[in-house]
Amino acid sequence: MSXDEYALNKQELKALIKELKKWKAPATVLLSLYIPPGRPIPDVVNLLRQEYSIAQNIKLKRTRDAVLSAIGAAIDRLNKIPKIDGNGLVLFCGENFDTEDFKCFMFSPPDKVPLFFYRTDKEFHLEFLEDMVEDTAVYGLIIVERDEATIGLLKGARIEILEEIEGFVPGKHMMGGQSQRRIDRIIDEMYHNFLKEVGEKVNAYFMPFVQNGKMKGVLLGGPGYAKEDFYKEDYVDYRIKNLILQPLIDVSDQGEVGLREMIMKAEDLLKNQQYIEVEKLLEELKYHLAKDDGLIIYGKEQIKKAMEIGAIEAIVIHEDSTDKELEKLAQDAENYGVKVFVVGDEVPEAEWVKKTFNGIVGKLRYRLY
């Protein structure tokens, strides 16, 4: 039995990540193991046996038993596989302290395992998998004014706020003479220092995405001239500056509201970006629902039948859905040429999709009746 027989697709992996994020432990008893393709299984098993011997010295009985069970389960499963091929292998083993259930998940992810990693911790280490299920293209988001800034990311249909920054930069004084010039210099220095602080934070947040080639562009906006000053001066790394899309965008608000406004105003710059597509589709669904023109469809069975005859153009699914049939519909949709958009609470209409349509709604190519 090879690792390929345990392969998960992206939709299945996304559902598993969601489940594993719920697992927490009061002690370091949850085992995470990443094995890249080609790694000899005997080497991995020998390492685990050494860890098993060390774990026998843990003083607390329940912690000791939980760690030994996790390592033992991992060894048992690896001994059933002759080699690690395909994209490699990932194992998560441990006891759920809330339910007292013990489980061991072993699978081959949709992309290659990037490194060998072993750890027992209070939670499963999922960070190496999360990039596999997210859109590869990421857009940086910056809103800046004299004494406020918001830094965020646009990942697929999700807006993620990284930090909201507040400074103190007073307005210009009208005292006259040398006192005015001195105060103006102090204010200018405070303004420069604030923009410098914003730039340093932007570099810290964005450079990892730039270095791994995932940042496709950066939107820069704000209500006044600060965005122009921020762009003209070297407040950010030149590699980030080269990704700033033109023109800069006039935005009236900070925070999530401001980021949404900036994204929608940048529609022409973000052609075919998933967030824009989702917002447009949701507006179309509302329009067709209001017109009652027969171009909106909901209900699992109705959507399934319409999909099988090629009548559906796109479907929207709420990410919190735990219905296995909905997950299967989403997996099958691509085979029928249907666009699938998974939305979460960061999209304002997500709750509407969840409550009004039980988590799934579609747009038809043509009327069925």
UniProtKB/Swiss-Prot annotation:
Pfam families: eRF1_1, eRF1_2, eRF1_3. Keywords: Cytoplasm, Protein biosynthesis. The keyword Protein biosynthesis applies. One of its GO terms (cellular component) is translation release factor complex. One of its GO terms (molecular function) is sequence-specific mRNA binding. Its main location: cytoplasm. It is found in: Cytoplasm. Heterodimer of two subunits, one of which binds GTP. Directs the termination of nascent peptide synthesis (translation) in response to the termination codons UAA, UAG and UGA. Belongs to the eukaryotic release factor 1 family. This is Peptide chain release factor subunit 1. It comes from Saccharolobus solfataricus (strain ATCC 35092 / DSM 1617 / JCM 11322 / P2).
